């Protein structure tokens, strides 16, 4: 007989190749029947199923075969070329005889198993010749079809290999409980019970719970909580990616799909398919003119021979399924909306026990409420309940990691002990009095530390054991509850009653006592090394990590920082007290959670002449509040003077160049939502750009070119403008009242900006012209920065009051603000110091002294 791929099915040829590898790894010269049987057991699902039905212990066979192969004679090296053993040839001849009798085209795995039953050694392990009639009868029953071509894989094997039995998972307690969603599950059951077109498709955003609804249906089928038309049905989830993967030859993928469909059809409605991401069936496997999966599904879907549940997102349904009306009409749409915050809290309460058992922690109710509410407010690019569940999962995982790791206090003592022991070894070599005295002190300190170390380690182990005991009890309770459900389903009521009213109650009492003892130890005021409960702060910490937004409760240092915020800003920004008060008040409202959650933290329009501190105040706010200079997004609005500049802000629309890049403003906020947005010189932007900002200022959101909703609800928006600066200058010179200045500037604003734009701003702040004494304070700030730069170069810096007055008088100009002062400091001081450094004038005396000499700045 020929041993070539064309004579075998794919799975049978894979078995032959694997048996060859087993023989090579065992340093054999021949491929024997034992190698074939071991390969079958390891790889073939149908063989495993047949052997299990024949009451054969597969693990024992595998162990016996391994020992038989180890006992065989071995070559010195692995053999590249192997011979077909006599026993193997007999096996394949018998397999071929069965193929002929079944009218199959190629040899498949079940034929090989039949051939092995005639082998002297293998027949003792699996099937002896007396059981061959039973085997043939079993094979006829299990085979739903004959092998029809060289790409045959039985439908049983295909379903087992590429499908997951959700009803079995529900029976085994693997699936999470499904809370709520009764209306959606009822609608799904209603469509499945139709005579034709009984195929629901669940459509919703990612993470709203489409797959969970199908899992809920599987649990209802197992519990018998469904109409008679769905009782005792199998719900099998098919993975389209796995079906396509590995289909090397043309037609192989279609064959796999056909095998699945024929198995479903032959089950006479007992099997319901679930295809997650059902949009993947459109075009799947369509290469070189072959049919795609959707065209293979359509006939059976229309006739009602196949009951299929699909799940996909709104966008994917629109892009793929709606393009094929023939496929779309065969499915009935069920819209799945994201649950409300209250519904999400109920879902989390239902899942709490599963996560507590998995992570060996306790999850408080306020943590569940925080996960739902904080995720809804701060995580805007994902959907409930998925994002809330992820928060709980990560917070519990983080706490579990802390529990299983060494506590920080013990770790610090361990490091200190190691450091002192090294110092001790070093000092033992010394003989002077100082070293001996130091050695004595170290030994005393080491003695105290080791006692403390031992006490803490004992306490840590004790607390850890208590937590582990509670965790083990929860696992036992979960396992007992599963056994009770299984006993009730199999009508073993005696066992169910014994478990429910005996074992379960006993375990619950033990858990209650242990939990109360642990809670009492926390309440007693004892200092505990470990914490077992996930609380609000844990959830807030995870949200902060994800979004960079501080949402945790304010600690004392942060409260002090916010209370002193106004003073801090006044130290860095001179002469603009009204602006500073307005900004600090807005930030205090936001950080204490009193601001409107549906608007930006604050939106300001800074007006005033050039050089009075509009942009500088924005930079100082970003540095002070967000603790980073990178938390400011600055857009120079003179770059947005054309009408088409709108696309630069929010991103180009589909079909235009740069669509994938996104907008300059929207992308910056999407990546860093907790930041300050500075739109400099807003009056220079095109009117259409201002119209785009209306929604941002009012609702705190904007839709970018790619259709994503970008949230500005955690941003401070600052717009600066020079409008009315000439009026402010003229009126300031005449010492006009501030209210008069404000009224005149407002008139100019209304001429330029639309009323709906001005009405959406929180505050319009007018920056006043700088007075001479204020400019002197600014000069001191600038010189302090210079001093800090010189200190890094080991140079001391001093300047006389006369020199400062000289700088201020020579740079004072109402029209230009503080910028001329910066220029004169650069020209008169920094340039001269730079020349002195280059001339090595500071090698001996590391001091820079600035004074006035002959009416000019003199750098000594």
Curated annotation (Swiss-Prot):
InterPro entries xrefs: AAA+_ATPase, ATPase_AAA_core, Clp_ATPase_C, Clp_N_dom_sf, Clp_R_dom, ClpA/B, ClpA/B_CS1, ClpA/B_CS2
Region (C-terminal): 770-860
Domains (record comment): The Clp repeat (R) domain probably functions as a substrate-discriminating domain, recruiting aggregated proteins to the ClpB hexamer and/or stabilizing bound proteins. The NBD2 domain is responsible for oligomerization, whereas the NBD1 domain stabilizes the hexamer probably in an ATP-dependent manner. The movement of the coiled-coil domain is essential for ClpB ability to rescue proteins from an aggregated state, probably by pulling apart large aggregated proteins, which are bound between the coiled-coils motifs of adjacent ClpB subunits in the functional hexamer.
Cellular component terms (Gene Ontology): cytoplasm
List of residues binding ATP 1: 204-211
Positions contributing to ATP 2 binding: 608-615
Region of interest (Repeat 2), residue spans: 84-145
Protein name: Chaperone protein ClpB
Coiled coil in keyword set: yes
GO BP annotations, alphabetical order: cellular response to heat
UniProt organism field: Prochlorococcus marinus subsp. pastoris (strain CCMP1986 / NIES-2087 / MED4)
């Amino acid at each position: 007989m020929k041993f070539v791929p064309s004579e075998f099915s794919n799975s049978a040829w894979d078995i032959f190749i694997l048996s060859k590898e087993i023989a090579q790894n065992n340093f054999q010269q021949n491929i024997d029947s034992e190698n074939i049987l071991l390969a079958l057991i390891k790889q073939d699902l149908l063989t495993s199923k047949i052997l299990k039905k024949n009451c054969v212990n597969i693990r024992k066979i595998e162990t016996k075969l391994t020992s038989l192969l180890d006992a065989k004679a071995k070559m010195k090296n692995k053999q590249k070329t192997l011979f077909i053993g006599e026993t193997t040839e007999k096996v394949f001849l018998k397999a071929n005889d069965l193929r002929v009798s079944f009218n199959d085209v190629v040899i498949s795995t079940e034929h090989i198993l039949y051939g092995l039953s005639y082998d002297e050694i293998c027949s003792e392990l699996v099937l002896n010749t007396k059981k061959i009639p039973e085997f043939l009868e079993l094979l006829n029953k299990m085979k739903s079809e004959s092998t029809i071509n060289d790409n045959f894989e039985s439908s049983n094997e295909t379903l087992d290999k590429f499908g997951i039995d959700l009803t079995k998972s529900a029976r085994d307690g693997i699936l999470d409980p499904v809370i709520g969603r009764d209306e959606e599950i009822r609608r799904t059951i209603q469509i499945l019970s139709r005579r034709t077109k009984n195929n629901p498709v669940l459509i919703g955003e990612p993470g709203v719970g489409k797959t969970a609804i199908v899992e809920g249906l599987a649990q209802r089928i197992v519990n018998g909580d469904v109409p008679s038309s769905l009782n005792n049905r199998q719900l099998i989830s098919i993975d389209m990616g796995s079906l396509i993967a590995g289909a090397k030859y043309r037609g192989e993928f279609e064959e796999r799909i056909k095998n699945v469909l024929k198995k479903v059809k032959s089950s006479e409605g007992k099997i319901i398919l679930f295809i997650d991401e059902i949009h993947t069936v459109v075009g799947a496997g369509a290469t070189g003119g072959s049919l795609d999966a959707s065209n293979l599904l359509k006939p059976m879907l229309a006739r009602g021979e196949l009951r299929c549940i699909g799940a996909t997102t709104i966008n994917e349904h629109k892009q793929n399924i709606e393009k094929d009306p023939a496929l779309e009409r065969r499915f009935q749409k069920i819209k799945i909306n994201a649950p409300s915050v209250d519904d999400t809290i109920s879902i989390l309460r239902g899942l709490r026990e599963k996560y507590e058992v998995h992570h060996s922690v306790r999850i408080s109710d306020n943590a569940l409420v925080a996960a739902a509410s904080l995720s809804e407010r701060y995580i805007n690019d994902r959907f409930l309940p998925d994002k809330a569940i992820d928060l709980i999962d990560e917070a519990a995982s983080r706490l579990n990691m802390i529990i299983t790791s060494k506590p920080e206090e013990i770790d610090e003592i361990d490091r200190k002990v190691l450091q002192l022991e090294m110092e001790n070894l070093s000092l033992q070599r010394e003989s002077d009095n100082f070293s001996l005295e130091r050695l004595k002190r170290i030994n005393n300190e080491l003695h105290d530390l080791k006692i403390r170390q031992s006490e803490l380690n004992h306490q840590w182990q004790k607390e850890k054991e208590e937590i582990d005991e509670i965790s083990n009890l929860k696992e036992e309770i979960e396992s007992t509850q599963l056994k009770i459900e299984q006993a009730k389903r199999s009508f073993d009521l005696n066992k169910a009653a014994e478990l429910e009213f005996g074992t379960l109650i006993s375990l619950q009492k033990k858990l209650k006592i242990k939990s109360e003892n642990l809670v009492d130890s926390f309440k007693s005021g004892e200092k505990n090394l470990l914490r077992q409960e996930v609380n609000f702060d844990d959830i807030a910490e995870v949200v902060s990590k994800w979004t960079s937004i501080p949402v945790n409760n304010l600690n004392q240092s942060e409260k002090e920082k916010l209370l002193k915020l106004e003073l801090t800003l006044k130290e860095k920004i001179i002469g603009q007290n009204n602006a500073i008060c307005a900004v600090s008040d807005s930030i205090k409202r936001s950080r204490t959670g009193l601001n409107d959650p549906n608007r930006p933290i604050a939106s300001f329009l800074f007006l005033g002449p050039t050089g009075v501190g509009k942009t500088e105040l924005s930079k100082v706010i970003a540095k002070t509040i967000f603790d980073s200079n990178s938390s400011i997004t600055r857009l120079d609005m003179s770059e947005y003077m054309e009408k088409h500049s709108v696309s630069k802000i929010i991103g180009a629309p589909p079909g235009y160049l740069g669509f994938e890049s996104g907008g300059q403003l929207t992308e910056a906020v999407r990546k860093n939502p907790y930041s300050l947005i500075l739109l400099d010189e807003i009056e220079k932007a095109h009117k259409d750009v201002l119209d785009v900002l209306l929604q941002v200022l009012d609702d705190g959101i904007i839709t970018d070119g790619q259709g994503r909703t970008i949230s500005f609800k955690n941003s401070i928006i600052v717009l600066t403008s020079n409008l009315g600066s000439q009026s402010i200058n003229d009126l300031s010179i005449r010492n006009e009242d501030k209210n008069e200045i404000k009224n005149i500037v407002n008139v100019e604003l209304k001429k330029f900006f639309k009323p709906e734009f001005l009405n959406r701003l929180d505050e319009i702040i007018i920056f006043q012209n700088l007075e001479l004494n204020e400019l002197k304070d600014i000069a001191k700030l600038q010189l302090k920065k210079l001093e800090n730069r010189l200190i890094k170069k080991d140079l001391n810096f001093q300047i006389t009051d006369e020199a400062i007055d000289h700088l201020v008088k020579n740079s004072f100009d109402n029209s230009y603000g503080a910028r001329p002062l910066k220029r004169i400091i650069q020209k008169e001081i920094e340039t001269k110091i730079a020349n002195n450094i280059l001339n090595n004038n500071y090698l001996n005396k590391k001091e820079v002294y600035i004074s006035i000499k002959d009416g000019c700045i003199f750098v000594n």
